Each structure stands twice: as structure tokens, then as C-alpha cells.
UniProtKB/Swiss-Prot annotation:
Primary location: cytoplasm
Protein name listed in UniProt: Sulfur carrier protein FdhD
InterPro entries: Cytidine_deaminase-like, FdhD
Keyword Iron-sulfur on entry: no
Role description: Required for formate dehydrogenase (FDH) activity. Acts as a sulfur carrier protein that transfers sulfur from IscS to the molybdenum cofactor prior to its insertion into FDH.
Organism of this sequence: Sulfolobus acidocaldarius (strain ATCC 33909 / DSM 639 / JCM 8929 / NBRC 15157 / NCIMB 11770)
């Protein structure tokens, strides 16, 4: 369940009245790897398999689906993974909240150079925010979720996920690619609904995605690693304009 109805007091023009509202659900997902408690992720329930695969990929526990012997939900908020690659799993038991994308080991140690000749167009970039918004079913009811979507270079929607954490939504995108055995994904565009921080860009780069676009601003670290990795970073996509912060040669005008 991703939506919950709650009772509220609604205030308007100095008057208060009892009412109801719909809010996005946020609950903990406990991840066990090789029977060890690895992490607790605060997330919007749904697509937990994809979220877990994306998280484990970013944290360097897996490189592909071949590294996963078994993955199963033991309850609504508990998932167990058994690895085939003999990776040592330290019992860390840390909590990743909905605003923290690099609370674990993450991608701080290395940035790989992207290998992609992908190109897209000005028209495609401009069209993505509306395509993202029109497919945000839970946000349209609650106004409380971030979203990430993967598009082809011609602007066709491949997948979209919503979550209270923008990094979770990206992990779900990447986890779905792992599940479909489609990594690295070097011919697509990642579109996100909010600002573009370090964690968003680093996750996309690790998955091979060459173009990252957002409706808001990127951070300085996001720009730095996109430049170093050869990724095209686009921000403030609004109306018929946008800013290209790195590698503009991938976008034809």
C-alpha cells in the first residue's frame, strides 16, 4: 500500500474544519544478505525487489543478477538475499532515511568513464518533465513522492518509479534493469523530479546511463563527477528551456 487516508484539521480564511487527506506511506524495509542484517531503508512500499537489487548494486555487493542465488520477501517489510559470489557481508544494521542516498559505502571510491556515444535532441529533453509528471499516479493523489523515469533517446518511456526518497526511485530504476539483465544501459536518459545531487548522478553513471536530467538544480559535486565521467547533466528543464552543465555535445539543437 502506497497511500493512506488520514484525518486532518483544514484551515482556510481563519476557519478550521475536520477533513481527510491522502498521504504517501513511508515504512522501513529491512534487508538481510546471507542471513546478516545489512540495512534498513525508509521507503515507499512497492517494487522492493527492484529497490534491493539497485541498492546492492550501488553498494558493490552485486554486479549482475548472476550474483544473486535467491531473493525473497519474508514479510511486507523484510527481504532476504542470498549471494552466489562469496562477497563478505558485514553486519552494519544502518538506517537509510528518505533523504539520504549515500549513507552506506556508496560510490565515493571511484568514478568510471562512461562508454557511450548516445545522443538525443532538444525536443526530447523538453518533453520529459511532462511525461514524468503525467505518469506519477501516487504523487497526483498525495503530492508527497519523488519520481525517477528511464526514457529511450527518442523520449519513449521505459519505466517509472515513485518513492519518498529520490535515491530510492533511482535504485528501483536500476534494479529493474538488473532484473531484466540490461546493464550497463548506455542508450537512455534518466529523468528525475527534483534536484540532482551527487547520489543520483553517481548511481546513473555506475549503471552506464549517459544522460541525467532534472527539473531542478544540480549540486556542485554532481556536476564535478558528471564532467569527470563523461555524462551529460541537464537541469532546470522547464517550459522550452534547460541548462546543460556537462558534455552538451550529446544534445542536438
Amino acid at each position: 500500500m502506497q497511500i493512506r487516508k488520514v484525518k486532518i484539521s483544514k484551515v482556510k480564511d481563519g476557519y478550521r474544519a475536520s477533513s481527510e487527506d491522502f498521504v504517501a506511506v513511508e515504512e522501513p524495509l529491512q534487508i538481510f544478505v546471507n542471513e546478516k542484517n545489512l540495512a534498513i531503508i525508509m521507503r515507499t512500499p512497492g517494487n522492493d525487489l527492484e529497490l534491493t537489487l539497485g541498492f546492492l548494486y550501488y553498494e558493490d555487493y552485486i554486479n549482475s543478477l548472476r550474483d544473486v542465488e535467491e531473493i525473497s520477501m519474508l514479510s511486507d517489510n523484510e527481504i532476504h538475499v542470498r549471494l552466489t559470489n562469496g562477497k563478505f557481508v558485514e553486519t552494519r544494521n544502518f538506517v537509510i532515511n528518505s533523504s539520504c542516498g549515500i549513507c552506506g559505502r556508496g560510490f565515493l571510491n571511484a568514478i568510471e568513464l562512461l562508454k557511450s556515444d548516445a545522443k538525443t535532441s532538444n525536443e526530447v529533453i523538453i518533453s520529459l518533465p511532462e511525461k514524468l509528471r503525467s505518469n506519477q499516479g501516487v504523487f497526483n493523489i498525495t503530492g508527497g513522492l519523488h519520481a525517477a523515469a528511464l526514457f529511450t533517446l527518442s523520449g519513449e518511456l521505459i519505466s517509472i518509479y515513485e518513492d519518498v526518497g529520490r535515491h530510492n526511485a533511482v535504485d528501483k530504476i536500476i534494479g529493474s534493469l538488473i532484473h531484466k539483465r540490461r546493464l550497463p544501459f548506455t542508450e537512455g536518459i534518466l529523468q528525475v523530479s527534483g534536484r540532482i545531487g551527487y547520489e543520483i548522478v553517481s548511481k546513473a553513471i555506475k549503471a552506464g546511463i549517459p544522460i541525467i536530467s532534472g527539473i531542478s538544480a544540480p549540486t556542485s559535486k554532481a556536476i564535478e563527477i558528471a564532467e569527470d565521467a563523461g555524462a551529460t547533466l541537464v537541469g532546470f528543464v522547464r517550459g522550452n528551456s534547460f541548462n546543460v552543465y556537462t558534455h552538451p555535445e550529446r544534445i542536438d539543437l
